[in-house]
Amino acid sequence: EQWCVAVADGISNSPVAEQAAYTVLNALMQNKKIETCQAFTIQQYLVDQLAHQKNSFGASSTLALIQNNGEQGFVTIQHIGDSRVYLFSQHDQKWHCLTRDHNYLEQLRENGEIKEGGNYASIYGALLQYFCADPLHEVMDFTTTEEYLTENDALLVCTDGVHDVMECTEWPALKVDMELRAWLLDMKASLDSKQA
């Protein structure tokens, strides 16, 4: 069975952020066939839809998506920005982040220029890659990975609003017989207590 799950998150300091996210998701829907998405196509759609109006020029969004094109057990993960995809592994009963943010801090980490656990100014979290309603904006190709899922593994696609509050190592475990609604309520309670 073929399917696609995605989340787009409008960048809060850009104009009409919610409209940017909606437009990015709409760009995905324009492609009726399930196939690997091209970041350039989504970028061009956003430009065509929003860059030519004064109030929406520069509207920006991130995107994370998971696709299954029918290959047994394998999913394709694509993302730009700081929306993420997580895996809950039934094997080790832990959540694992499958994507890396496209920001300056992550770039420094990849280059070995920062110390784990160190405090860094919030400016280092600035995004390096995102979609933007500006014809001069260049977007890189998606970061694409494949993941093999085993029985009772679970995937979660989310925005930075979740992982900025609580890292996945603190998330409640997902039990095989647990209803998704119960897990989501546990997660919401955990997030609420972190923000209090």
Language-model-detected regions and their locations in the chain:
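PP2C/PPM-type serine/threonine phosphatase catalytic domain
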Residues: 1-196
